[in-house]
Amino acid sequence: MRALVKTSPAPGLELTELPDPTPGANDIVVQVFRTGICGTDLHIDSWDEWAARTVPTPLVIGHEFAGEVVAVGSAVTQAQVGDFVSGEGHLVCGTCRNCRAGRRHLCANTRGLGVHHNGAFAEYAVLPEQNVWVHREHVDPDVAAIFDPFGNAVHTALTFPVVGEDVLITGAGPIGLMAACVARHAGARNVVITDVSEHRLELARRVGVDLAVNVAETGIADAQAKLGMSEGFDVAMEVSGQPSALRETIENMAHGGRIAMLGLPAERFQIDWSAVVLKMLTVKGIYGREMFETWYSMSVLLQSGLDLSPVITHRFPCTRHVEAFETARAGRCGKVILDWTVR
């Protein structure tokens, strides 16, 4: 099979031939149709400090994918050959306190598909049965391939009630855009998104936000005034990882406001804890997806008409992976998809 491999501890990836995988007793083999390029994949490609201390080589990378089950292990009980599936990229231990309590997204022993174990940027991928979501209704393969980051967006957007609320989203990358789609679809009153990239802000306008703000030019307080708001945002979603974004978010929250924080800062930073206390704010960290409640929510949202198509802006055959990665890294895009069905 063809696979995109980090062959050595150095920058770059190689599209190479590997033996087709075989399933263990509890595993399934998926013929991969589409994959999505994630920021994690860009880190592994460039071989930055994080990748060098985290990722073993050689390794098939990639964790966002969709495809068809083509083989199952002897102990598999639910997935069947022919099922169309997406993959959950977090591999959990199944034996810790949280796993045994059904809180698998809180497993302290989580490992990453395409980070610690061979991933899905290949014509075939193998993973545990418990890590696949079977699509019972039709889902576009491109959309099915990004259920992993879509799940991050849904987990973030729905962790607090948004019906009738004024919502602020800091960061208009693919996850921020999908979070905006979800918040709007779920009944938020105003949805405001911020970024410093006009290209991404234009994508946000296409998905239907009420206001897209370039914070290099305009403050969030000015956005409040433009929408006729006077008491601050009820719910915020920080997905940029920028310290300044969280600081300005706190300044613009309503008393009793709630902040879902998915963005990962590159280093420690200070915030105004006095404002958090005096405003009685709730700040909640978000990591991955709730397995598999978030996946159920994703499917229901799509079945009820949520449209993610504007978020997917570029598609490449896997043979043009270098161009695809360059496009994703440049940032003038939404989600970038690799097609593994073309030779």
From Swiss-Prot:
Cofactor binding note of this UniProt entry: Binds 2 Zn(2+) ions per subunit.
Site positions per UniProt: Important for catalytic activity for the proton relay mechanism but does not participate directly in the coordination of zinc atom: 148
EC number: 1.1.1.103
SMART domains (alphabetical): PKS_ER (SM00829)
Keywords assigned by UniProt, alphabetized: Cytoplasm, Metal-binding, NAD, Oxidoreductase, Zinc
Keyword Zinc: yes
GO biological processes: L-threonine catabolic process to glycine
Catalytic activity, reaction form: L-threonine + NAD(+) = (2S)-2-amino-3-oxobutanoate + NADH + H(+)
Positions bound to NAD(+): 175, 195, 200, 262-264, 286-287
Protein origin, superkingdom: Bacteria
Job of this protein: Catalyzes the NAD(+)-dependent oxidation of L-threonine to 2-amino-3-ketobutyrate.
Name this protein carries in UniProt: L-threonine 3-dehydrogenase
Organism expressing this protein natively: Saccharopolyspora erythraea (strain ATCC 11635 / DSM 40517 / JCM 4748 / NBRC 13426 / NCIMB 8594 / NRRL 2338)
